[in-house]
């Protein structure tokens, strides 16, 4: 099926969903992109052709002020549970002296919370998962143990997209593996991540009895680095980015204005993209353009796989009653590669020559300048930060009851609102006890009645998030943020204040002009932090490189020296709850 025909099929599926019988339980599909920038896809101003996502946007709603976490695993934990990342157990991507051994920092899903998979399974849904997990790889935290009937899971945070499954770096190696229904599996020669995840999901949906509803979690690893795509997809974008950073950025800004996401009088961040491009030699420009070409190919390929999913829904008669959510975990990744705490020897295995960029055996990242383009209108601050560019990401929803087709809504919505929203659409009681002991109540609120137009006032007025002492508190048009530089010891920084109505791109800190507001908002944030189990990051950074099979303890190391941290400071798996 060609792209136009596929997009037309998607449009028919999504339009039909709006007319499904309300008493029939909807299928629910959550699709996640990994490290994707705010304006990469066409529904949010991107030049990369994404016809299937565009059709979804036109038949559903876009939330332009959707807030998430600065990084992947914490965001996924909030999404899957409706709780804060600390409540879920993912208070960090690593530890500090002050957080290791503390509740909220187990670095895996705990039984303090209930997952969407567990609740949908209890309600009779066939619960399916394909793609990135990143929520724990110790007993009790795997997809099968957290509610999925079937799961084809990449367990770690990132890997190469072909069948060689090379880890992101030295310390990532121990959780770089795939499982199918809990058993480790090898990958076929023709494996490419996005295609394999969609193919497996399509197969499971087709095998599900027609009378049984489906809850599907399709978590692409695209476009997370290393940037890789099949040759035929890379060729489609040949020459497209040789105009350089600034021109692509300007075109995206113009489209964002046309969509109404920003306005003509919106203050823009200071960038020198023309200067940065002109500082490159012609050979460097050609190489850098090729890297972005690969990135675009990854997103276009992902969209095509979403199209195959839509076709499967049509073939199985589920097209008129499927609630579809698309989002990304965090902002664009500005890293330039050769990081992830790896040894120099690790990087010697890659062939990053021009001809091999994007192919198996290469490892490239697009760096801060393309990240500024990818994340437009946000710039300078991206993934890992509490700036808008780190936590304000794409969100779309379509299906039964979503009637405001094509609308872009600027109401504040939180990542932990997704679970309660989907529960209400499916008629699931989120307070029903599924465990032997009580779990924490969700902090998210349902947007169901707002999304269907039953009420006109959005249910959320504020949003809080914390990760590694990066913090943000959004209250209406005001935002308080703390930007902490990343290093081998925990940092600190004063609060900054921004008026998102006048300055949505955070170009002018007005904290000094509004001390009373800073005080009130910081007190509100501290109350949120206390309620959601936040422990302030202090002291040295501590990473983990595996699990000791003899003692059942995490193998914790000092990343500055890669020497083990004394065993008493590590967390016994048996004590994690």
From Swiss-Prot:
Name of the coding gene: atsA
Active-site annotation: 72, 134
Assigned protein family: Belongs to the sulfatase family.
InterPro entries with a match to the protein in the record: Alkaline_phosphatase_core_sf, Sulfatase, Sulfatase_CS, Sulfatase_N
UniProt remark on cofactor binding: Binds 1 Ca(2+) ion per subunit.
Protein name: Arylsulfatase
Localization (cell): Periplasm
Reaction(s) this enzyme catalyzes, per UniProt: an aryl sulfate + H2O = a phenol + sulfate + H(+)
Gene Ontology cellular-component terms listed: periplasmic space
Pfam families reported for this sequence: Sulfatase
UniProt-annotated binding residues for Ca(2+): 34-35, 72, 329-330
Role description: Plays an important role in the mineralization of sulfates.
GO molecular function: arylsulfatase activity; metal ion binding
Leader peptide range in chain numbering: 1-20
EC numbers on record: 3.1.6.1
Species in which this protein is naturally found: Klebsiella pneumoniae
SUPFAM superfamilies found in the cross-reference section: Alkaline phosphatase-like (SSF53649)
Gene3D superfamilies given in the database record: 3.30.1120.10, Alkaline Phosphatase, subunit A (3.40.720.10)
Origin superkingdom: Bacteria
